[in-house]
């Protein structure tokens, strides 16, 4: 799907480096594995919902052999007008279970470029997931180098830590603004790496944060929030984790903003969930 993935111009400029395999996702991944074995660095540009068909090939043909294949995952998260079957709300779950796979999510267009450069330079399989539509141009004042398994602190506070995954970070910034207006001093984190988990940052924040809030456009089961919750329960049981994610059902067609509100991922929904949490009520 060269048009949908934005690769029409690339295909015209570099016809010998562009392969349209049609609607054959399984073949695309195994083809990329073969290219990697031949010494090339293939980039598989594909929709999140379509990549689900190639989970077996990703596991056995790419990850098991730890091949250097880059997955550029378009339409990740809520896609709105594309329809119910195109909602990309499962990729963080099925990607995170794969050994050797690194899973990244950029906050804006500039960071997507950084992550692509990182993916080309590193070894092994890398997945970068980003949303449908025009690239977000905000939060440009923050651009620390991309380092394996390292998140980025946007604002340092105390008591509440809000951890936003990829495209949700801009809304997380609005959530934090609302919390500050209500007298709180939240920390805002750009997750960057869903896998490997930045446990060093979690350990550091656990010292002066009692509530960790994860925000992602992915189903809760197997998502970033569950991985954070499992780690915190094992290593910092005094801290609590609130996960803001997609409900356990299929999301219908609709505009992204209205869908977020409908499933409890709107800015005000998240802020209210934080302020109504048992952790803050006890203080």
Walk through the language-model features, giving the residues of each.
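Thiamine diphosphate
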Residues: 1-124, 134, ...
């Amino acid at each position: 799907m060269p048009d949908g993935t934005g690769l029409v111009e690339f295909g015209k400029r570099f016809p010998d480096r562009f392969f349209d395999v049609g609607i054959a996702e399984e073949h695309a991944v195994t083809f990329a594995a073969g290219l990697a074995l031949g010494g090339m660095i293939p980039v598989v540009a594909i929709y999140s919902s379509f990549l689900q068909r190639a989970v077996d090939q990703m596991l056995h043909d790419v990850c098991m052999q730890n091949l250097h294949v880059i997955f550029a995952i378009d339409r990740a998260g809520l896609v709105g007008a594309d329809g119910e079957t195109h909602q990309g709300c499962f990729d963080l779950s099925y990607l995170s279970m794969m050994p050797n796979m690194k899973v990244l999510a950029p906050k804006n267009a500039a960071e997507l470029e950084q992550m692509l450069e990182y993916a080309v330079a590193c070894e092994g399989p890398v997945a970068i997931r980003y949303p449908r539509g025009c690239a977000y141009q905000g939060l440009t004042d923050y651009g620390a180098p991309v380092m394996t398994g390292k998140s980025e602190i946007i604002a340092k506070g105390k008591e509440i830590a809000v951890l936003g995954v990829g495209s949700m970070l801009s809304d997380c910034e609005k959530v934090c603004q609302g919390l500050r207006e209500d007298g709180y001093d939240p920390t805002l984190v750009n997750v960057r790496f869903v896998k490997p988990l930045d446990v060093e940052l979690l350990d550091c924040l656990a010292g002066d944060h009692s509530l960790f809030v994860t925000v992602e456009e992915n189903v809760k089961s197997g998502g970033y929030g569950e991985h954070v919750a499992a780690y915190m329960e094992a290593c910092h049981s005094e801290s609590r984790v609130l996960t803001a994610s997609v409900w356990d059902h299929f999301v219908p067609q609709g505009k992204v903003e209205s869908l977020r509100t409908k499933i409890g991922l709107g800015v005000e929904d998240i802020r209210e969930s934080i302020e109504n949490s048992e952790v803050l009520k006890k203080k």
